Regions:
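M16/insulysin-pitrilysin zinc metalloprotease superfamily fold
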Residues: 363, 374-384, 392, 396-397
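Core structural elements
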Residues: 224-236, 327-351, 361-377, 414-417
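Amphipathic alpha-helical segments within well-ordered protein domains
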Residues: 323-327, 350-354, 372, 391-398, ...
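Conserved mixed alpha/beta catalytic, RNA-binding, or beta-rich assembly cores of soluble enzyme
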Residues: 39-40, 210, 354, 365-375, ...
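Strongly charged, low-complexity linkers/loops
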Residues: 382-391, 404-466
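Short, amphipathic C-terminal "tail helix"
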Residues: 456-483
């Protein structure tokens, strides 16, 4: 699709808004947990939201649209993960220092100017995702940039804000939200207008920005923890905002399909939601500038030079240097190095390869390929496995107590029985490594069958020894025995 369209001739303009949850102990304005582990609500409250005029006397068009939909909002409350602050029954507490530190580090990594005083603002949102009818947000960085293909990509601003409640269902004007996501610290990174780039290049730019944020090792991972909003226009046409692209790999397709929609339809300024297949659906009119006003319950926060200097001293290794180090020191391919850089297992990967005598490519492939495949194809709940179990797994590999082919089966076992160890998996699955002599003994009767081909003999032998010896070694043994 991309080859058939000249995006430069269309004057494609794109603006990115990347939202990344921070992995802090507490929420942004209270001491509730951010882990979202609770499944059963302890109560449900019901609200109706109404728009109010800004200090200039105007009502935001998007807020008015949501109000006219006349919906009722039902909020699920969870123990230790929701409190009076989320219910809008209590003023916000002091801004979370851990979240501010991390957000400022991200802004510094993006070469932003940091204001010497920051102010929490209220942004009107009455779609029900905020019980208060507004989202608290604070600008903590401006005028930053990253480099891409020799060009400077403008980062207009970085904001620290509270995440919205997660929608559970909507039917007949009744909307149900979970309150445990509301208030989790979230960093929003906004780019300047990207013009002269293809959808694939814009996706690469989004990836680079995401890597910068995740290099702090203080960001959450998994579905819903990072979301992209994208603003798109062509040929001086109206701007369309598309919200909620949850998979980075879908971003280029969303842009391509939106360009085609704008070419084939008469469009107007509006906000649309991204679907899982890359198409979009109408949400509401595009919001205006009348929905921002000061948060009166939180005083301005002074950002001193000493504070910023201390943060600069503890900035993580730049991702570009880490990428080159992974490729040169660990001999990872460019693709594998980039994948592990963006993985939630990055820190664990570095810990293992720095302390174990195992091949880094095997460790990286386990975390970015094997685990993904098991989660996608077999719905294995890998998140049930602790870091210590993974470390134990590679201890066994280092000591040659298992072969790399056994890793997928062991991971499946550990996910099913997280209380058990790798040793238990070996016994239960009968994955004790075989010697070449033992394989020859198993293969003897098979290769001696009349008219059997190498491919068939190899397949039969592998079915009997899979996970107990390297596949290349089996191939070598069978070839030798069939000469």
């Amino acid at each position: 699709m991309d080859k058939k369209i000249n995006y430069s001739a269309l004057r494609l303009k794109v603006g990115l808004e990347l939202h990344q949850q921070l992995d802090t102990k507490y929420k942004l304005f209270c001491n509730c947990s951010t882990q979202m582990k609770e499944k059963i609500p302890i109560m449900i409250i019901t609200r109706k939201l109404h728009p109010v005029a800004s200090e200039l006397g105007t009502v935001d068009i998007a807020a008015q649209f949501e109000y006219l939909r006349n919906r009722t909002f039902h909020y699920q409350v969870f123990n230790n993960e929701s409190c009076q602050v989320e219910l809008d029954e209590e003023p916000p507490h002091e801004l979370n220092k851990e979240a501010l530190d991390t957000a400022l580090q991200i802004a510094l990594l993006l070469n932003c100017d940091i204001p010497n005083e920051i102010h929490v603002m209220r942004k009107t949102v009455i779609d029900g995702s905020n019980t208060s009818g507004f989202q608290r947000t604070v600008i903590i960085g401006m005028n930053g940039h990253i480099n891409y293909k020799g060009k400077r990509i403008l980062i207009t601003q970085v904001t620290l804000e509270e995440d919205a409640a997660a929608i559970v269902s909507e039917e007949n004007g009744k909307v149900i939200y979970r309150l445990n996501r509301l208030g989790i610290p979230l960093v929003e990174i906004d780019t300047g207008i990207l013009e002269g780039y293809t959808p694939e290049e814009i996706q690469e730019i989004a990836y680079l920005i995401g890597i910068m944020a995740r290099s702090t090792s203080k960001t959450k991972h998994g579905i819903g923890s990072i979301r992209q909003d994208v603003n798109i226009s062509i040929r001086n046409g109206p701007r369309v905002e598309i919200k909620g692209v949850q998979e980075l790999g879908l971003l280029s397709k969303v842009i391509e399909l939106e360009v085609q929609r704008q070419l084939n339809e008469k469009v107007k300024e509006e906000t649309r939601a991204a679907n899982l297949d890359g198409t979009t659906r109408f949400l509401r009119p595009l919001p205006g500038a009348s929905r921002m006003y000061p948060e009166t319950d939180i005083p301005p926060i002074v950002i001193t030079k000493d504070y910023i200097e201390n943060l600069k001293k503890n900035l993580p290794e730049p991702w570009t240097k880490k990428l080159e180090r992974f490729k040169t020191k660990f001999k990872l391919s460019d693709d594998l190095a980039k994948e592990i850089l963006g993985s939630e297992y990055l820190n664990l990967f570095e810990r293992i390869v720095s302390t174990k005598k195992v091949e880094p490519s095997i460790v990286a492939s386990t975390f970015v390929s094997i685990i993904k495949d098991l989660e996608r194809r077999e719905k294995v709940e890998v998140n049930r496995i602790s870091e210590n179990r993974f470390i134990e797994l590679f201890d066994y590999l280092q000591d040659k107590k298992i072969v790399k082919e056994a890793i997928p089966e062991i991971i499946k076992y550990l996910a099913a029985y997280p209380q058990n160890g790798v040793g238990d998996a070996l016994k239960e699955l009968d994955l004790k490594p075989l010697t070449p002599a033992e394989v020859r003994e198993i293969a003897k009767e098979i290769v001696e069958q009349p008219n059997i081909t190498f491919e068939k003999a190899y397949g039969i032998v592998m079915s009997k020894v899979r996970g107990k010896i390297d596949a290349q070694e089996v191939m070598k043994i069978v070839k030798q025995m069939m000469k």
